[in-house]
Amino acid sequence: MTQTPDATGAAADARWLARRRGALACVALAPVAQALGRVERVADGIAFVSGLEDAMLNEVLRFDGGVTGFAHTLDEDLISVVLLDPDAGVQAQTAVTRTGAVLEVPVGPQLLGRVVDPLGRPLDGGAPLGTADTLPIERPAPEIIERDLVSEPLDTGVLIVDALFTIGRGQRELIIGDRATGKTSLAIDAIVNQRHSDVICVYVAIGQRASAVRRVIDAVRRYGAPERCIFVVAPAACAPGLQWIAPFAGFSVAEYFRDRGQHALVVVDDLTKHAATHRELALLTREPPGREAYPGDIFYVHARLLERAAKLSAKLGGGSLSALPIAETDAGNLAAYIPTNLISITDGQIVLDSALFAANQRPAVDVGLSVSRVGGKAQHPALRAASGRLRLDYAQFLELEAFTRFGGLTDARLRAQITRGERIRALITQPRFRALRTLDEVVLLKALAAGVLDAMSPDLVAPLRERLPSWLDARLAPPRDRLADDAALSMLAESIGELVERVAADAAHRAAAGGHAEDAADDMGGALDGEHASGDATSIAPTPPGGAEAGAPRKR
């Protein structure tokens, strides 16, 4: 039935009246009281505020001029507020208001491939994040009943780690060692190796130089899958407050994917600098110092952070969040305060030794001090069987090698152990960005156990490792799980002597030709290293994708 003009006008009036009523319902009919605080003093990124007795711990406070901070400690008369922006414009008597909200960070797929600060603000020159999803940076760790056993391996592609110190999905494995021993390199190799997996990687940089972060981003863009990585960066030049919240923000970003049944990996580089920042803030806010001037809650701060890494039960989607925190030691002192705290919190540690690093063993993993407490249950059965005696044989070799410095060996059995140990050391010495598949690792270890590698020079192990994947692919049919056929793998390991002879012949031919091929390869490697080390020290934006892809390795 067609409406008359009068009926149409009445309907429009009714809609207008409904809109006006809705608008008026939001209008306060009486003055609204809002607590207003004042800055008493400000220095070193900390503002002491009075007049906000009802403020909550970790609540976001806003200063006149737009600067924000969060309540760090609550006293009777003053609140210490950690500033998240440069404190320019914040001075005594500046007005401060509450927001009633806690710190949150944007989360979601829109962050993949981006470089952001702990508040989600882009640092890569890209567009602002188009996501409305946020999570608090402080979230409770999953309860015991919500967790499941760690049963799946997180493949790093590094033979010594996968074979001896397996990391499981949902595990917390500490990477610890002196300065410049390859801690970040080992963690980045683990990230790069996820380029063919279903793991989302989050790299958190705390207090690092912008040039160092730039090199990490370039390495991931060049060798890994940057479209499945997120970089949360709080460089050394930013406010201490941003450095303090960075690891918590990184975990929240990763938990978004874990809670949806996916798998995530968080690398925190590094918690030693985070502990120093926490000590700095505590001393500035007059908290009582404890051992090594750290406040008494430093253990709790790191424990509540790392406990958020977990393997969730199937009822909650079965997702996992693995953590690779990094810590720095001073002169190899693992008994210092922060290292002992982190070792007791995590599920194991990979200890890097400066003497091994100086001896050109990369990664410089100390086999005697490293351990993985839960990852062994997640190790692939074929790899577990192949690496059964590896640790014992290598430990015996290191002990025998120390004695051989005082004289020669006449016992044939001891000479055989030395020979085997030299091949083991050559196997576990692995260049960066040369990840091995689990299949490659199993065949190499089986060939080692069968004595196939004993007759070859240790110098030929590296070219053998490079040519092994294509050799295996040509001889193995592509079933769904080629690691299940143990008999076929054992036969391949025993017949690898064919490849060994070919590698030895090629090496002899190059030596006869004057080593031109090696010189050319060294020149190319030096060019890549020089390109990798270059860059603006003040910018952390990655290099353009076109330049990064030009040197990308062939995918296997």
UniProtKB/Swiss-Prot annotation:
Topological category with respect to the lipid bilayer: Peripheral membrane protein
Principal location listed in the UniProt entry: membrane
Binding site for ATP: 177-184
Keywords: ATP synthesis, ATP-binding, Cell inner membrane, Cell membrane, CF(1), Hydrogen ion transport, Ion transport, Membrane, Nucleotide-binding, Translocase, Transport
Substrates-to-products reaction catalysed: ATP + H2O + 4 H(+)(in) = ADP + phosphate + 5 H(+)(out)
Composition skew (Low complexity), residue ranges: 546-556
Keyword rRNA-binding in record: no
Family matches, as PROSITE patterns: ATPASE_ALPHA_BETA (PS00152)
Entry's Gene Ontology molecular function annotations: ADP binding; ATP binding; proton-transporting ATP synthase activity, rotational mechanism
Pfam families given in the database record: ATP-synt_ab, ATP-synt_ab_C, ATP-synt_ab_N
Superkingdom to which the source organism belongs: Bacteria
Sequence segments annotated as region (Disordered): 514-556
Enzyme class: translocase
Function recorded in the entry: Produces ATP from ADP in the presence of a proton gradient across the membrane. The alpha chain is a regulatory subunit.
Subunit and partners: F-type ATPases have 2 components, CF(1) - the catalytic core - and CF(0) - the membrane proton channel. CF(1) has five subunits: alpha(3), beta(3), gamma(1), delta(1), epsilon(1). CF(0) has three main subunits: a(1), b(2) and c(9-12). The alpha and beta chains form an alternating ring which encloses part of the gamma chain. CF(1) is attached to CF(0) by a central stalk formed by the gamma and epsilon chains, while a peripheral stalk is formed by the delta and b chains.
PANTHER family named in the record: ATP SYNTHASE SUBUNIT ALPHA, MITOCHONDRIAL (PTHR48082:SF2)
Entry similarity comment: Belongs to the ATPase alpha/beta chains family.
Protein name, as recorded: ATP synthase subunit alpha 2
UniProt organism field: Burkholderia thailandensis (strain ATCC 700388 / DSM 13276 / CCUG 48851 / CIP 106301 / E264)
